[in-house]
């Protein structure tokens, strides 16, 4: 049980690191100019989805860090942790299918694989918290 709490909190902190990283995307990728090639509608959709992604990552960090025992003790853990797991699984698949293999791929793979595994362990554990 203590291991599950530790794993979820580590995964939560990694998710919060992704929040910080994503907050720098706008200047890092020069989106002010780079997104000018998109129609105003596609630009708005892109930026909206990015904001939602940041919010989702924030949720994926805060809940496991501050509500770990509540999460593990609830039947909602199956839905919530499955969603977290799928989020990172989709990101891993996207790394190779949409972005292509690059020099940063191993780092992204590891940074996504660790929380994906850590979020999945409580799903398959028989331990329960009351």
Model region roles, listed by residue range:
Residues 1-18:
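Cytosolic juxtamembrane helix and N-cap/initiation of the first transmembrane helix
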Residues 1-4, 68-75, 101-102, 128-130:
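Membrane-interface helix-boundary motifs at transmembrane edges
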Residues 13, 17-26, 41-69, 82-88:
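Core segments of alpha-helical transmembrane spans in multipass integral membrane proteins
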Residues 27-32, 58-70, 92-98, 122:
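Membrane-helix exit/interface motif
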Residues 36-45, 73-76, 100-112:
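Non-cytosolic membrane-interface motifs at loop->transmembrane helix junctions
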Residues 74-84:
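Short, amphipathic, aromatic/basic-enriched membrane-interface segments that mark the entry/exit
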Residues 85-108, 125:
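Membrane-helix boundary connector in multi-pass membrane proteins
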Residues 114-130:
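Membrane-water interface at the C-terminal end of transmembrane alpha helices
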């Amino acid at each position: 049980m203590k291991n599950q709490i530790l794993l979820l909190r580590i995964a939560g902190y990694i998710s919060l690191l992704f929040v910080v990283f994503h907050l720098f995307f706008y200047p890092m990728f020069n989106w002010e100019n780079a997104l000018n090639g998109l129609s105003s509608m596609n630009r708005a959709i892109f930026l909206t989805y990015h904001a939602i992604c940041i919010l989702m990552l924030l949720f994926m960090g805060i809940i496991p860090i501050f509500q770990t025992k509540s999460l593990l003790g609830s039947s909602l853990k199956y839905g919530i942790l499955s969603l977290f797991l799928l989020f990172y699984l989709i990101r891993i698949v996207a790394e190779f299918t949409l972005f292509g293999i690059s020099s940063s791929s191993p780092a992204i793979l590891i940074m996504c694989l660790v929380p994906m595994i850590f979020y999945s362990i409580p799903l398959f554990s028989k331990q329960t918290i009351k």
